[in-house]
Regions:
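Short, charged, intrinsically disordered terminal tails
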Residues: 140-144
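Charged, amphipathic alpha-helical coiled-coil/dimerization segments
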Residues: 81-139
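N-terminal helix-turn-helix DNA-binding core of bacterial DNA-binding proteins
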Residues: 29-72
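Pre-recognition alpha-helix immediately N-terminal to the DNA-recognition helix
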Residues: 19, 26, 46-50, 111
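N-terminal leader segment of winged-helix/HTH proteins
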Residues: 1-38, 86-88
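Short, hydrophobic-biased segments on the C-terminal half of alpha helices
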Residues: 62, 80-81
Length: 144
């Protein structure tokens, strides 16, 4: 991979990075607003999305979820407790390893998540081309 030096940074790069950051921040702000409108705290929306979208083969344990969320174990347990009380998720013991507890999404949680993801996809259709253009500007090979 070629090394990029300070001399390789152009005005286009600054503009592209600024635009990229603006669009990403705007997307997350709108996502948080949509979550609140749906009756969720934004962190609960992120949790449901993470839970439903875990990589194949990754077990939905508190430890794995905490790591993926960037939270401490006890903070994740508190989040799971609150969401379980609302009927969005539930805990289930592993059949193979009885000491493992998995977190699962309920039909109620899945229904809310599905609506939110559908609206987020529509927003990405609008913002996507701008994000792609900015990424292309930032990642194109320097020709000198």
């Amino acid at each position: 991979m070629p090394k990029i030096t300070n001399n390789d940074v152009t005005l286009s790069d600054y503009r592209a990075l600024a635009q990229f950051r603006y669009e990403v921040r705007r997307y997350f702000t709108l996502s948080d607003q949509a979550a609140r409108t749906a009756g969720l705290h934004p962190g609960q929306y992120r949790f449901l999305l993470l839970l439903k979208g875990l990589p194949e083969g990754m077990e939905p344990t508190i430890s794995n979820l905490a790591e993926r969320l960037g939270l401490r174990h006890h903070s994740t347990v508190e989040l799971v407790d609150r969401m379980e009380k609302r009927g969005l998720i539930y805990r289930e013991r592993s059949e193979r390893h009885r000491s493992f507890v998995f977190v699962r999404i309920t039909p109620k949680g899945e229904g809310i998540l599905r609506k939110l993801v559908a609206s987020r996809k529509l927003e990405l259709k609008k913002a996507g081309p701008i994000l792609v253009k900015a990424l292309n500007t930032l990642t194109k090979k320097q020709t000198r």
